[in-house]
């Protein structure tokens, strides 16, 4: 089973942060910000592949191998372990998309597909 996540577009996150900094709307709150839909890692890879015109597939790796790879990239073990726990939990307990993003941004949140289109050049 793949992890299900609701990735948030950085423009939506930035808009929510600006609102939080410039108003009192979010004082004493801790909103959970998400993108508008749940997607699997395989779906993410497929969308990136479609955008760049090359097939990309998601390949599941053993958590210890993933940890070793992250360590080789200079990622601290505490961060690597946190990421691995996040994705493991997202398999059985995905964080559902929240409407708070629309409320904070003032418009519907951007989809993962839109994020991919906005970042296509980054994948080439």
Task: Go through each PLM region and give its residues.
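Rossmann-fold dinucleotide-binding core
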Residues: 1-7
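Mid/C-terminal beta-alpha module of Rossmann-like enzyme folds, strongest
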Residues: 11-82, 93-124
């Amino acid at each position: 089973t793949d992890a299900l996540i609701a990735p948030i577009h950085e423009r939506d996150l930035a808009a929510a942060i600006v609102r939080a900094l410039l108003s009192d709307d979010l004082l004493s709150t801790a909103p959970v910000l998400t993108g508008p839909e749940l997607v699997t890692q395989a779906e993410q890879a497929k969308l990136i592949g479609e955008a760049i015109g090359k097939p990309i597939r998601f390949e599941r790796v053993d958590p210890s191998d993933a940890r070793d790879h992250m360590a080789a990239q200079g990622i601290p073990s505490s961060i690597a372990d946190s990421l691995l726990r996040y994705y493991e939990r997202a398999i059985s307990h995905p964080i559902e998309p929240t409407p708070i993003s629309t409320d904070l941004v003032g418009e519907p949140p951007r989809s993962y597909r839109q994020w991919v289109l906005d970042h296509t050049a980054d994948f080439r």
